[in-house]
Amino acid sequence: MPSAIETDGLIKIFRNRWSGREVRALDGISLRVEQGSTFGLLGPNGAGKTTFVKILLSCARPTGGRATIFGRDAGDAEARRPIGYLPENHRFPTYMTGRSMLNFYGSLSGMSAPARQERVPELLAGVGLADWGDVRLGKYSKGMLQRVGLAQALMHSPSLLILDEPTDGVDPIGRIQIRGLLHTLEQQGVTIFLNSHLLSEVELFCRDVAIIHRGRVALEGKVKDLTAGSGYRVEAASVPEKVQDALHARARTTGQGNGNVVFVFANREDANEAVDLLRSAHCEIESVARASSTLEQVFVKVVHEQ
């Protein structure tokens, strides 16, 4: 079974027509996104994320290397048929209603009138806009435009969904609703490729991520593996100062969390001894767990090390 997305040594060089100066936006990107996966592409501004997506959509041609969609060359028109796309900056006609806009984009995708008639209300309800279908887009908020934009990308039931900042400007309730819809699509086997600066959203939703920096892959892997830390985290309440001093000497790091004292130990033995000491001092132990990092911490570390 071919990968949903696969690139091999992808290079893109932009040349200034006046100065002749070259800018290497992509410098040998090799990535594989398996069918049915949820994949997040991360990177600082100017890392090459947008250029990478443009090549997948055949809006730009690579200088070198190859990109395929479900085994077909990304430049092949047939490769784009199973793709649904939500750009970061979309410009839908403001005089259209949500319903008429979705109907229009469905027709561009080759959907029949009966199929569009059935699909439009289903999607409007799915993105929480069932009561706004007959309202002109000019009266939609930014978050509402993002949600109807997602519905547009889903009109023709794509096998691969490429989303560029899908929750930008969306309120917390709307984000939860969008995540729920995306999880449903994931369960249906849709491959979801997410390009976002919201690392917390990527961490909540994606199973696999790649961080690119200066046109190269700096790190890739499963989110759970990349955020797995080393050591053990012990959180306790009502810890006397004398006990804190004793544990500070053994703990790798210490801190405060929710009014409690947090200790991180390098190994299980130190953590067990700390728990025994806290219990003997009649402290309230709130939690003992493996230490972990957030995706944001991993991202910052990788970018600063490059």
Model-derived segments and spans:
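Conserved ABC transporter NBD signature motif
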Residues: 65-81
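Conserved ABC ATPase "signature" region
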Residues: 103, 107, 114-132
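A short, proline-enriched helix->beta-strand linker immediately N-terminal to the Walker B motif
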Residues: 155-159
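Catalytic Walker B motif of ABC-type/P-loop ATPase nucleotide-binding domains
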Residues: 161-165
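ABC transporter nucleotide-binding domain
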Residues: 178-265
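Short, charged/small-residue-rich alpha-helical element at the C-terminal edge
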Residues: 231-305
